[in-house]
Regions:
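Rossmann-like AdoMet/SAM-dependent catalytic core
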Residues: 84, 93-97, 106, 113-115, ...
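A flexible loop/linker signature enriched in serine peptidases of the S9 family
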Residues: 2, 9-19, 38-42, 60-67, ...
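Conserved beta-propeller blade repeats
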Residues: 1-9, 40-59, 87-104, 132
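Beta-rich carbohydrate-recognition and catalytic domains
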Residues: 69-72
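Structural beta-strand/beta-sheet cores of well-ordered domains, especially the beta-sheet scaffolds
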Residues: 4, 18, 31-33, 45, ...
């Protein structure tokens, strides 16, 4: 992870986080780079570091729908990549650990399930913990 930068969200006029920026420590805020912007006024955004500290995840969500993007912490010019396109009523959250990506979702699982895959580009998800 590059300790010269940090990421933050910026609030819109309704005090909702809708944009993610990257700031270089010691530089002017005027030079901050817009990394992600949520276009829907119903959705808010946040950014987090994966458990294995290899990826940043940008999550955008409303009350019952979510969508997530990712990029590697080593990327010099971060370009968030979509994990799974938003689908109304489907909530999901992806994290990475031990060489796998884990997805906690209610997609076809009212009480949620956890799936995993080893590659987000191919996304061959397998059930890790089934819904009850």
């Amino acid at each position: 992870m590059d300790d010269q930068y940090f990421f933050y969200s910026k609030l819109d006029e309704f005090h909702r986080p809708r944009k993610i920026f990257r700031h270089k420590i010691g530089s002017s805020v005027k030079n901050d780079e817009l990394i992600f912007e949520e276009k829907s006024e119903a959705f808010t955004v946040g950014i987090s570091l994966s458990s294995d500290e290899k990826y940043f995840f940008i999550t955008t969500s409303d009350h019952n729908t979510s969508e997530q993007y990712y990029f590697e912490v080593t990327e010099k010019n971060p370009k968030p990549k979509l994990i799974i396109k938003r689908n109304k009523g489907v909530i999901y959250s992806v994290n990475s650990w031990g060489g796998y990506f884990y997805c906690h979702t209610n997609d076809d699982a009212e009480d949620f399930k956890i799936e995993r895959c080893d590659d987000l580009l191919n996304q061959k998800w397998e059930i890790y913990i089934a819904a009850k």
